Structures are given as structure tokens and as C-alpha cells.
Amino acid sequence: MPTHTCPTCLKEFAQKGHLTAHLNRKKKCEPSALVIRLTSLEAEVKELRNVVVLPTEVTPMTAISLFSGAGGDTLGLERAGIKVVAFNEFNEAATKTHTTVFPSSVNIVHPETKDSNIRNVPDSAFESYKNKVQLIMAGFPCQGMSHAGKKRVDDKRNELVHEFVRVTKIVQPEWIIGENVKGLLSRKGRLNPEAPLRPVIEIIRDLFDSIGYRITYQVIDVSTIGVPQNRKRLIIIGHRGTTYPHVPWNSLTDASTPPTTSIRSFLEPHLDDAMELPALYKPQDQPSHYWIPTTETAVKGTPHKNLDRLTRGLRNRSSAEKVADPTGPDQLIEPEGLISFGVRKGGYYGMVVNPDVPCNTIISTYNLCPRLFVGLYNPTIRKYWIRCMTSKELGQIQGFPATYQWQGTEKEKIIQIGNAVPPPLAERIGRTILAGRVELKEEAQGLEATEAVTGATGATVDDDDDE
């Protein structure tokens, strides 16, 4: 049987009419102890709400990307939780890709001419971001840095690193991240013709020091952080102020799952622009892991001219050979061919990649002179082919998703991929900074720049600027 309860004294009645009579009587009932306690608690909660500031939505860290390319650093930073509100990129195809994938990120250009060459973008275009952006990341080119005075080292605008410094000085972010080839550590330069040659990294350190930023740097092999490619890159991390950032470089490789070391899942079993491998290479004697199984039986399209040349064993004569025989032919035939497996035997050679280990470094000139090839085998008809990698495959080897919306021609896409910052690299660095794991100390971290992590084994690692 349902009961009816007085909200004051909590006395129960079998009939609703009895409760009504109880509530309407002249002598009101006394509140029960439980009601008194609940009333007191409600008052306390109300009072606390007046003095306690409840947390509001956290404003995400924001960033600007310079020399952005197709957006590898932007993708990585945004995956880490850092919003890239603006970027600067000069290349038209790369700009289209970045704008397509990140439509809310603004390309900072000259306000009147719309020139996106950072050298021509005035200070005023960056001033609106002053003290509003917490991070700048720049995969800055440094190919123009003088060596032995062969270039106009007195022209500071000749070095794009100066643009990185200029924008940093204007915007005043808390953090800066720079990315470059590891070979930068071995280069020397100078800021003016009278100055002695010294390591470029020291010049960069002093440039940032002069505007109030302290830096540390390290070489990272991206194969240790989820990118299936032996690609070693110099990473510079700086902080505004007088204290030095101490980065837990080894922890960049910390992950709940092991990094991807195989490229097999990225390689597609088609014969587009492929070339049948001649018998002289004895493909049937090569280990089976070099071959991607295919059911296709006929080549579609035209093989790249460099693939055709290498497969036929045709190479240019060296300078020494020309001196020895000035009347000889411009090109020579290597009777054993110029295709090797797993390891490039020399500068002339092309290589069939091992799909089960990290790939050699992908460079922006791959489409011009490819030397890394995919091997394919049809077991039914027992034929072997090799072909160049596609932009879709190369993009995934660089750490981009297969669905990334690359814009431009196939050549333009490959240039963008070769120049890109691998997204997982930018993501790991961004997460490390956001998590507060970069300590600030009075002394420098130690700028020996030995490699923080070593690459996975199995494939040769060529120079930064080559496959």
C-alpha cells in the first residue's frame, strides 16, 4: 500500500487526505533531524558556489608553423592538442595541400601583394599574433649557409633561419621548435665576411640567445617513434627566458605500442609503370620477403626512365673514366646490372626495398631520380617486376595517413612528401611540451648533440640528402 510522507517531520500516512489534514493544522510539525541536516548541507553548498571558481574550458596551446610545406608539423602538433592557427608557405602546391587539410589555419602573407615568400612578408603581418601564440615550429631550410666564404655570408636575408628568428622576436612565443637535417651539425658558416668560420649550430644558438631564447638540440631517428623510415633529423627546442630547456629526449620514444618498422602494409600489389626484372638479376634466388605478391599479369603505363636505365645496367661515365679515355662513350653498361636488394651497393645503384624493415630516407627528388623500388611477384606465371613507389605509399612511409589530401601533380606531391616533417615526430615533441616534461634549469642541457635514439636495424642509412 502506498504511503504519503510529510516533507518536514517525515511522518508517514496511509491516506493522502490524512497527510493534507496534517499539513493544514494550525500547530506545525517539527522538522526531523534528517531534514535539518539536509537543509544545512544545501546552504553550505550554496555558499561554496559563491566563493569557489569552478574550472572553465581549458584554452588550447596555439602555434604558428613556418616553412610549413604540406602540413606534416601541423598535423603532428594538432594531434598533440596544439592548435596551429596560422602558417607560412611559399610553394603553391604545398599551400593548397595545407589549406585543404587545415582550412581554418591562415597563410600569413604580405597584406597587399599577397606574396607568401617569408622574406617579403612584413613584420606587421606577424604582429597580430604577438603574445597570443605559445609556440612556433619551423622546418627551416638551411642550404644557403656559407661554406668557406663561397656565398655572400654578409647577406643575413640569404639565410632563412634569420626569418625564423625574426618572426620569433615579433611574436614572442614561449616555445620554439626547429627541424633540420642532421648534417647541419657538421656545417660551418659566418654572419659577415670578417668573422671566422664556426659551426652553424653555434650561430643559430647565438641568434636565438640574442633575442632572449635558450635552446637545446638533439638528433632523432624517426624510425624509433613510429615512422618506418631511417630518417635522422636535428631537432632544436627553445624556451623564452634565461633558463635552459632540458628535454627528456629518450622519452620521445616511449609508447604503449612498439613503433612501426615495416612498410609492407603500405605497398600495393599493382604493376602501374612497372618493369619486368631481367633474368640476369636471378630474382628467383632472392629471399621471398623482397616480393609483394600480385595477381596482375601485365604492366600498365611506362616505367620511369631511371628505373629503365638502372635495370638495363646503364650508367654515366665517371670523371676519372673520362680522363682515362676522352674518346669513350658517355655511358657504360654494367654487365651485372645496377639493381641490388636491401642495400645499395654504391652511388650508381638502385635498390629493391625490404618491406619488413624501415625504408631508406625519402627525399624530395625521388620523382626525378628514384633509386628505391618495390619488388612484385606473380607466383602463378612466375614473373618478377619492380616499380617506383607512388605518392600514396611514400606519404605513409613519411608518417602521413593514407587518406591525406595531397594536392598537385604526382611530382609535386612527392616533393611535398620528401620535404615534410614526419607528423609523428611533431606530435611526440608537442605532447612532451604540453605534458610539462621539459624542465627549465639555470645551466644548459649539454649541447653535444649525440643521437638520443638509434634507428631500427635491417636497412642501410644513407646520408641526409640522399635515399
Descriptions of predicted regions:
Residues 171-174, 213, 232:
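A short helix->loop->beta-strand "cap" motif at the edges of active sites that frequently abuts
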Residues 54-175, 181-202:
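Core alpha/beta nucleotide-donor-binding catalytic domains of modification enzymes
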Residues 188-211, 230-235, 239:
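Short, electropositive alpha-helical surface patch
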Residues 34-51:
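Amphipathic alpha-helical oligomerization/assembly segments
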Residues 213-224:
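Conserved S-adenosyl-L-methionine
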Residues 1-36:
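C-terminal recognition-helix end and immediately following basic linker
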Residues 54-85, 207-210, 233-467:
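S-adenosyl-L-methionine-dependent DNA methyltransferase catalytic core
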Residues 129, 222-224, 347-350:
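Short, P/G- and charge-enriched loop/turn segments at secondary-structure junctions
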